[in-house]
Amino acid sequence: RFDDIDFDKLPDKFMLKVNHGAGWNIAVQDKSKFDKADAKRKIESWLKLNYCYLMGGLDVQYIHIKPRIIAEKFIENDGGDLYDYKIFCFNGEPKIILHIEERYTDKEERMFFLDTDWNQLPFNINVPLELDADLPRPANLEKMLDIARTLSQGYTAVRVDLYSLNDGSIKFGEMTFTTESGISRWHPESANDFMGSLIHLPGVDDAPAEGNA
C-alpha cells in the first residue's frame, strides 16, 4: 500500500513505479517538493487497473501479476543525458538496437534504430525517420549486447532495455515482450515486415507445409 511507504528512508531523489504496467512511474528529483497526495492518487488508481485489458488484451504478460509498488534509485549520468538502449533480441540473439537520447531533458526526444554493428537503419517508430551520421558508438556496446544475449535466452522475441552511463557502467531497465503494446506506427510501414521476418517460431517455422508432409 502507498501508506506503508516510509519516505523518510528514501533519498532526496528516487523513482516510484508499479510492477504491472508500462509508463506508470513518478520521477522525484527533490523530495522536499514531492507532492505526496498527488502521487498517492495516481498510484492507487494504477493499482486498481489491469494493464492487459487496458491495451486490448495485447499485453498478456501483465494479466496475472499481483500489483506492487516499487521505489528505486534515481539514475543520473554525471550531469549528462541518460542514454537508453533498447535491444531487440530474437531467439536469444541481439538483432536491432533502439537508441534514445534527450529522454529526460527539456529538449525534444530523439530516437534511432541501428543494427548491432552500429549502422543506422532506415526506419523509426511513432515519429518520422531521422538520420544522424555522427551518432557516437558507445564504448561498451559489446558488453551491452552480451548482457542482452544472456538475458534473452529461452525467449522467441524480447526487448532488453539498458542504460549506459558516462563512467562506463550499465544499468538494467526492463525486459519488454510487446513493444508499444504492438499497436505503434512504423515509418515506413515496411519496417513491420522486416521486424516480423526476424521472428522464428520453433515447431511452427520448421513444420512441413501442408501437403508436403
Region locations from a protein language model:
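Short beta-strand-initiation
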Residues: P11, L82-D84, A157-R159
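Beta-strand scaffold of nucleotide-dependent catalytic cores
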Residues: D84-I100, M111-L114, K171-T176
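Short acidic-glycine loop/turn motifs at beta-strand connectors
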Residues: D30-K31, C89-E93, L165-G168
